[in-house]
Amino acid sequence: MNAPDSPNALAARSELTDLMQRMGSGAKVASAHMARASAAVKNWALSKLATLLRQNVKALDNANQRDLARAQAAGLAGPLLDRLRLSPKDIETVALGCEQLAAMPDVIGEIIGMKEQPSGIRVGQMRVPIGVFGMIYESRPNVTIEAASLAIKSGNACILRGGSEAIESNKALASLVQQALLDAGLPADAVQLVPTTDREAVGLLIAMPQYVDVIIPRGGKGLIERISREAKVPVIKHLDGNCHVYVDDPCDIDMAVRVADNAKTQKYSPCNASEGLLVARGVAAGFLPKIGAVYAAKGVEMRCDAEARALLAGVAGANLQPVSEQDWYEEYLAPIISIKVVAGIDEAIAHINQYSSHHTDAILTRDHMHAQRFLREVDSASVMVNASTRFADGFEFGLGAEIGISTDKFHARGPVGIEGLTSLKYVVLGNGEVRT
């Protein structure tokens, strides 16, 4: 390994800097072409990409298997391996996402809020592409297609920097994206993948405001905190996915069991999986033994307060552990859930607003007024009534795909789709008016 200041290390850094500058410059030029591209051309590129994905399932699987083998040899943890895996079903899902995006209306150039002013001028706002976004993500090779397809549909260019563990999968996917762009007559530089696993590429990408308009990180808390701290351009992000399900009094117990099960166990690794379960005292005795039996059968560890533990004590095979203060903040990404019995909706809302990551939280209830209070008062990017937190996803929300989920309150919040990758500029239409 070269010393940080050795001639070889300095030369390597210079080469990496040159590479990132070329990519940034190319993306900036390509973004102007993308902003002018017609809806028909962009949609054709997306349809072509869907076709290429389906035609290359075997090649993509081979690339992904190489990544998985290397990750397993390196001792990558189970949840991270799950995120790295790109199955034929995953490929079909992102292909469908491309087609769904192609079928959606093109919002670029849309003018909203046009009103005539007392002076006679008409003032409105036009939706335009952001320009160039940088996408930094770990594992999850499907993000390569989600980001690329949204860039195409929204008329933006993007620079993608995936995790080193997924480099083979990402290269294979990015090559298909560039083929689709070229076949559509669009610049290949509109979607570029950083071809190196050198971590210094991240530091360079987030410090190029002359080329990159926004950075969108998806990954572990450490990565996102670093980018938020060091970036010289705006960042759209979320740090954690500490999501909650609150079982209200009154509720449909059978429905609540079904939803609470799905929110936790349908898949453990996504950021919209439930990590906390709050149960109103009035329904706890009827609900907890039933959900406890489901969790026990699936090997879910239950970290409970004293009241919940007492109600779950008779469940065969239940792995019950005392809950700690830190558990309320925890994003487990594993078969573990924290459980608390609360007095009612007031305590549930207070608990969620104190401990959640403001990502996605759900109430299961038969009380319309409680549902409305929950929607108004829970300070999260997505709030749900009688539905699993696992629905907090751009594809499920009808966005076609998502670039990420933002828990910030500016510029975008919740799943970030096409509109989240645009900005509004004022347009003024006149007929020779002058200001007096």
From Swiss-Prot:
Source organism, top-level taxon: Bacteria
One Pfam family per UniProt: Aldedh
Swiss-Prot/TrEMBL GO biological process terms: L-proline biosynthetic process
Pathway as given in its UniProt record: Amino-acid biosynthesis; L-proline biosynthesis; L-glutamate 5-semialdehyde from L-glutamate: step 2/2
Record GO terms (molecular function): glutamate-5-semialdehyde dehydrogenase activity; NADP binding
NCBIfam families: PRK00197.1, proA
Name of the protein in its database record: Gamma-glutamyl phosphate reductase
